[in-house]
Amino acid sequence: MKITDIRIHVLKSPLAEPFAFSQGWVRWRSATLVEVLTDDGLAGWGEAFAQGLEPPEIAAAAIEHALKPLLLGADPRHIEVLWHRMYHATRDYGRKGSVVAALSAVDIALWDLTGKAANAPIHQLLGGAFRARVQPYATGFYRTRGQSEAARLADEALRHHEAGFRLMKVKLGYGVDDDIKCMAAIHRAIEGRGVTLMIDTNHAYGRAEALRLGRAL
């Protein structure tokens, strides 16, 4: 089996209601999809991570101009070899961000192809499943104004609880004082309901602010 072509599909859609997290406002939902084609008719699909701030065209360009030339004619089942080929070829300029996301998209597509070729689920190819069930968590708690949204976030926590979630990840990073107020409101709303809370500031704080927030929580 040989890779004959790699196609990139960029998806973008404006949001009716933009929202914010600590690094900025998200006004679009976007994705960079990659389709790896082979000479025996199989195709594998992968997706590059996009949080909503980076243009999906960056990962698309990395796949088209940096990664695709390294892969054409290769056996897609040689996943580890191809991963190192892509990583080492781009390590001087692509060890994080959209270039690594592009590499990840191709890697996912290669695993998808390999699973199809073997007619087996990927977890079997990776050595088996440790469990058949996982506990999901609700993420969200994004902002629509920025600060001073504690009451709305507490209501959101109650909705997640009513939907059956017992783990929740709260987006913070809007100022330590505001974060503390929001977490206090959320805690009061779900206290005694068997909910575990997690937080994610998306690298908003330095050491001093992170310690202050952690100690307060």
Regions found by a protein language model. Name each.
Residues 37-117:
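Metal- or metallocofactor-binding catalytic centers and their adjacent structured scaffolds
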Residues 1, 104, 163:
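Structured loop/turn residues at beta-strand edges in well-structured enzyme cores
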Residues 127-217:
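Metal-dependent enolase-superfamily TIM-barrel catalytic cores that perform enediolate-based chemistry
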Residues 1-5, 9-10, 116, 120-132:
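N-terminal amphipathic alpha-helix/helix-capping segment at the start of soluble metabolic enzymes
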Residues 66, 85, 105-108, 112-113, ...:
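Alpha-helical scaffold segments in soluble metabolic enzymes
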Residues 1-52:
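Structured beta-strand/loop patches that form or line metal/cofactor-binding pockets in enzymes
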Residues 28-31, 58, 62, 77, ...:
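Conserved active-site and cofactor/substrate-binding residues in soluble primary-metabolism enzymes
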